[in-house]
Regions:
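Electropositive polyanion-binding surfaces
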Residues: 1-249
C-alpha cells in the first residue's frame, strides 16, 4: 500500500538526520543527569456538538520526544543569547530542593529502605539514579510523586541561576510566545538586538531594520515585577487546570 515515507520522500533525509540528532541529544541529557519523571498527560476529547466526550491519556512517541529536544535546544540558545547581550529578560529558574523538603523526602524513602544520594546537596543525577532503581516497583508512581513534590517550583526570574531538573546552567522559555508572556518578552529582547544594529557574529542584520522593534523598554526592576507576576499567574493557571480535570474525571 501507499506509505507515508513515499508521500514525504522530499523531507525524509532531513527527518532521518533529525532523528539521529535526537538520539545524541537524549544521550547528552542522560549524561548531564537531567530528571526524567514518567508523567502521563491527558487531553479532552470533544464530540460533534463540542461537548466533552472523554478524557484520555496522551500517548508519547518518538515524534513528541524529537520536538521536545528541539524546543530544549531553542530555549538553551535563547538563555545564552540573552546573557551574552546583557539583556534584562526572564529566565526559567529551577532551584534544588530546600533543606526542609530534602529531609522530608529522605525520611519517606528511608521507611521504604531507599536512599537518595548526594548528601545535603543532591544533584538531578542523584534523583534520576533513584528513579531508575525504582521503575519496576509496584509503588513506583507513589515514590515518584513524593520525589517530585520535594523539588522547588520553577519560576521566572531576571537572575539566571540554572535549571536543576533539566541539568542546565542557563535556561529560558522561547518556544511559545502565543501563550506564555515570558516567551514573548524574550522574543522582544532578541528582536531589539537584531533590529538595533549591534555588531555580533550571531546576528544577521535584517534588510530593513525596524526602529520600533529595536526599542526594548524594560529594565531589571521591571523584569523583577514581571517575573513575580508571571510565576504567580502560572501557578494559578496550573491550579485551575488540575481542579477542572479532577472535577471532570
Amino acid at each position: 500500500g501507499y506509505k507515508l515515507s513515499e508521500q514525504y520522500a522530499n523531507v525524509l533525509p532531513q527527518l532521518h538526520n533529525l532523528y539521529g540528532l535526537y538520539q545524541l541529544l537524549r544521550k547528552a541529557r542522560t549524561e548531564r543527569g537531567a530528571i526524567d519523571f514518567e508523567t502521563t498527560e491527558t487531553k479532552i476529547v470533544f464530540d460533534a456538538d463540542r461537548k466533552i466526550e472523554e478524557i484520555v491519556p496522551v500517548q508519547r512517541n518518538d515524534a513528541h520526544k524529537i520536538i521536545e529536544e528541539c524546543m530544549l535546544c531553542a530555549n538553551v540558545a535563547t538563555a545564552r543569547f540573552l546573557k551574552k547581550h546583557k539583556l534584562p529578560a526572564l529566565y526559567r529558574v529551577h532551584d534544588g530542593p530546600s533543606e526542609e523538603r530534602l529531609n522530608a523526602v529522605r525520611l519517606f524513602l528511608g521507611e521504604l529502605g531507599l536512599q537518595l544520594g548526594g548528601g545535603d546537596n543532591p544533584t538531578s543525577a542523584d534523583y534520576q539514579e533513584l528513579l531508575n532503581s525504582i521503575k519496576d516497583r509496584s509503588d513506583a508512581n507513589v515514590i515518584q510523586t513524593v520525589m517530585l513534590r520535594s523539588l522547588s517550583q520553577a519560576v521566572y526570574s531576571p537572575e539566571e541561576s540554572g535549571h536543576f531538573g533539566l541539568g542546565y546552567t542557563g535556561y529560558a522559555h522561547f518556544t511559545s510566545p502565543i501563550r506564555r508572556y515570558p516567551d514573548l518578552i524574550n522574543h522582544r529582547a532578541i528582536k531589539s538586538v537584531i533590529h538595533g544594529g549591534q555588531s555580533s557574529k550571531d546576528v544577521v542584520p535584517p534588510p530593513k531594520p525596524d526602529p520600533e522593534l529595536a526599542v526594548y523598554p524594560y529594565d531589571m526592576a521591571r523584569m523583577e515585577q514581571l517575573g513575580e507576576h508571571t510565576s504567580m499567574a502560572e501557578r494559578r493557571a496550573d491550579d485551575a487546570t488540575r481542579d477542572v480535570m479532577a472535577w471532570l474525571k
